[in-house]
Design a protein with these regions (language model features):
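Rossmann-like NAD(P)H-binding beta-loop-alpha module
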Residues: 56-60, 65, 69-70, 105-130, ...
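His/Asp/Glu-rich metal-coordinating catalytic cores
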Residues: 67, 84-87, 137-144
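Acidic metal-phosphate-binding loop of nucleotide-sugar-dependent transferases
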Residues: 79-81
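Conserved donor-nucleotide/metal-binding helix-loop-beta segment in metal-dependent transferases, i.e.
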Residues: 83-116, 122
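Catalytic-core segments of class I nucleotidyltransferases/pyrophosphorylases
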Residues: 123-168
């Protein structure tokens, strides 16, 4: 579990299968004294999917986010399958001094595969210049794994900024 002791799973809709799959979290070897698996639900059901976003779910659970006593958050989706040591990912982020670190995978078959994924445009220092859909027009691409790490304080401020800019 990459030494991660506190896991929050945000669920927008149809939670039964997620809850059944995760169970109590005991099989993830989470330290029962200092860690926990927390399932967080969206407080409102929006009939319009355009407003049923990760941001709205984070906003509905802002109190839990604000109470976290951890300096960093790792945000990862449920629909990407990959193997990574998140502890190493976090340490690499801290050592880099970057505000946000994105996880990506260099591929050489982006013309035929990963067509539903976003790809990153990187500069020479591997800084992100763009995030855009993979249109299948290049063989070599950096596929964004929809996973990032940043300070908790920055994450909360970005959520609040998104709320102010949005029509939610």
């Amino acid at each position: 579990n990459s030494n991660i002791e506190r896991i929050q799973v945000y669920i927008n809709n149809k939670p039964r299968s997620v809850v059944e799959h995760l169970g109590t979290g005991r099989h993830y070897n989470i330290n029962s004294k200092s860690g926990k698996l927390q399932l967080l639900f969206s407080e409102h059901n929006n009939d319009n999917d355009i407003y049923n976003t990760d941001i709205s779910c984070y906003l509905d659970n802002m109190e839990s986010l604000s109470r976290m006593n951890h300096p960093y958050v790792v945000i990862a989706p449920s629909y990407m399958v990959y193997s990574i040591d998140f502890d190493q990912f976090l340490h690499t982020h801290i050592e880099s001094g970057a505000d946000v670190t994105l996880l990506y995978h260099a591929v050489d078959n982006a013309k035929e595969a990963y067509l539903t994924c976003n790809v990153l445009g990187l500069n020479r220092q591997k800084g992100v210049e763009s995030i855009e859909p993979n249109h299948g027009n290049k063989k070599n691409q950096y596929v964004y794994m929809d996973t990032c790490v940043m300070k908790t304080e920055l994450f909360i401020s970005l959520i609040k900024e998104a709320k102010n800019l949005s029509s939610m």
